[in-house]
């Protein structure tokens, strides 16, 4: 039976670090604050917003919402971004995506000040993931994966790591972050030939395929650590990951469950970025 890499244990440790940093800021009269920009009322956005605001409240971080109708003009949205960019009381900004089709998402994303970009929405932040510079922040989900590896003492140095998925949101940043941990990294994707033969050779597998249960027993081998980023609904309406958990779990050494794995860490990473942004500003 594989060891379960439980997100709640990682989150508890991360939250204690964040609370300590918030206390230091409060001593200086600084209240770390997240600006939340939401266009429309997509159910996924509303759900994540509830989780983010609840975590902010738990950790002593304030938030301010900027709620806009789905038919808002690009000009009006850019005005809001300019407002939060110039508001010294706002330290980090979360803008929900995707934006409505009538808005040029790239233009709007890159209008955000990089130092307030707590979920890697700007090209400046994304570039910093590859250069290692402290400009903006990495995407919250791949950083949550790294937090899990660190918490459970899984050393990446010299290890073979495979990332399934090449998106700019998870796959590519996760690969770069593993390289920074001195792993030897292979990225698999929809055009990879005989993917199971590649993934079986890995010590660490991060699965961000975006399809429920796509990674089965043939993809894994004994001794592996598997981080499942996927969040999907199965035919029974239950949350499940990109791994076929029942098939994979008996084989590997350690695995994150879904739910209860990566997703539960991501929100604390986001709030931690807000606090770090405030600390950078007033360092």
Predicted feature descriptions by range:
Residues 1-30:
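Positively charged, low-complexity intrinsically disordered leader regions
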Residues 31-40:
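Short beta-strand segments enriched in small/hydrophobic residues
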Residues 39-53, 136-225, 234, 238-249:
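Glycine-rich phosphate/diphosphate-binding loop of Rossmann-like nucleotide-binding domains
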Residues 56-70, 185-187:
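Short beta-strand elements in bilobed, periplasmic/extracellular small-molecule ligand-binding domains
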Residues 76-88:
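Short, well-structured alpha-helical segments in soluble
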Residues 92-156:
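Anion-binding alpha/beta catalytic cores of soluble intermediary-metabolism enzymes, centered on
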Residues 96, 208-209, 229:
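Short, well-ordered coil/turn residues at beta-beta hairpins
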Residues 106-126, 230-282:
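Rossmann-fold NAD(P)-binding glycine/threonine-rich loop
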């Amino acid at each position: 039976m594989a060891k379960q890499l439980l997100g709640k244990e990682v989150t508890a440790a991360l939250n204690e670090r964040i609370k300590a940093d918030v206390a230091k800021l409060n001593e200086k009269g600084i209240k770390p604050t997240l600006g939340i920009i939401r266009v429309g009322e997509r159910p996924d956005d509303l759900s994540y917003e509830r989780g983010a605001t609840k975590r902010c409240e738990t950790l002593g971080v304030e938030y301010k919402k900027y709620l806009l109708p789905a038919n808002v003009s690009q000009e009006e949205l850019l005005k809001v971004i300019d407002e939060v960019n110039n508001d010294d009381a706002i330290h980090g900004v979360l803008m929900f995506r995707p934006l409505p089709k009538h808005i040029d998402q790239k233009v709007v994303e890159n209008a955000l000040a990089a130092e307030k970009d707590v979920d890697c929405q700007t090209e400046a932040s994304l570039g910093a993931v590859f250069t290692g510079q402290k400009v903006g922040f990495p995407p919250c989900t791949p950083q949550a994966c790294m937090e899990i590896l660190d918490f459970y003492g899984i050393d990446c140095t010299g290890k073979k790591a495979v990332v399934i998925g090449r998106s700019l949101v998870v796959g590519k940043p996760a690969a770069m972050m593993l390289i920074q941990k001195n792993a030897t990294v292979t990225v698999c994707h929809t055009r990879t030939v005989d993917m199971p033969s590649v993934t079986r050779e890995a010590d660490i597998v991060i699965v961000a395929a975006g399809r429920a249960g796509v990674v089965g027993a043939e993809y894994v081998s004994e001794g592996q650590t598997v981080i499942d980023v996927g969040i999907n609904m199965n035919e029974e309406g239950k949350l499940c990951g990109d791994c076929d958990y029942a098939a994979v779990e008996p084989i590997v050494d350690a695995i994150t469950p879904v739910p209860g794995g990566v997703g539960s860490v991501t929100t604390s990473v986001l709030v931690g970025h807000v606090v770090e942004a405030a600390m950078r500003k007033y360092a």
